[in-house]
Amino acid sequence: MATERTFSIIKPDATARNLTGAVNAIIEKAGLRIIAQKRIRMTREQAETFYAVHKARPFFGELVDFMTSGPVVVQVLEGDNAISKYREVMGATDPSKAADGTIRKVHALSIGENSVHGSDAAETAAVEIAQFFAGNEIVG
């Protein structure tokens, strides 16, 4: 198995409900290591850059507003097949369709307030990690 790194965000709906520890417990139970983590208030510029792929979509403004509405926890996760494993642990974007025991099934409020983000590919993970972490902040 390939050891990989992936990027995670615990979103404002989850941090507002003090769920960081609960989400981290699910992540670690799945065998992923949290090798970098910080709680930040995402700026509008950071959110617009991060979600630039959705700029033409009708929900872009609401997404940026949501992601800047409160603190988020940005993380680097590491483990065997970390990208696919974390996507499995997160569950489907729509919490009503997420598998039992996944982060979104347990904690998400709606499709929009779905508690977490995870990278979808190695290339995306590298870009997302670099947007929020300097190399010396990642301690594997």
From Swiss-Prot:
GO terms for cellular component: cytoplasm. InterPro entries: NDK-like_dom (IPR034907), NDK-like_dom_sf (IPR036850), Nucleoside_diP_kinase (IPR001564). The active site is at residue 117. The keyword Magnesium applies. Its EC number is 2.7.4.6. It is an enzyme of class 2 (transferase). GO terms for molecular function: ATP binding; metal ion binding; nucleoside diphosphate kinase activity. ATP binds at residues 11, 59, 87, 93, 104, 114. Keywords: ATP-binding, Cytoplasm, Kinase, Magnesium, Metal-binding, Nucleotide metabolism, Nucleotide-binding, Phosphoprotein, Transferase. It catalyses: a 2'-deoxyribonucleoside 5'-diphosphate + ATP = a 2'-deoxyribonucleoside 5'-triphosphate + ADP; a ribonucleoside 5'-diphosphate + ATP = a ribonucleoside 5'-triphosphate + ADP. GO terms for biological process: CTP biosynthetic process; GTP biosynthetic process; UTP biosynthetic process. Pfam families: NDK. It is found in: Cytoplasm. PROSITE patterns: NDPK_LIKE. Its cofactor is Mg(2+). PANTHER family: NUCLEOSIDE DIPHOSPHATE KINASE (PTHR46161), NUCLEOSIDE DIPHOSPHATE KINASE DDB_G0292928-RELATED (PTHR46161:SF3). Major role in the synthesis of nucleoside triphosphates other than ATP. The ATP gamma phosphate is transferred to the NDP beta phosphate via a ping-pong mechanism, using a phosphorylated active-site intermediate. Belongs to the NDK family. HAMAP family: NDP_kinase. Homotetramer. This is Nucleoside diphosphate kinase. The lineage of its organism: Bacteria, Pseudomonadati, Pseudomonadota, Alphaproteobacteria, Hyphomicrobiales. The gene is ndk.
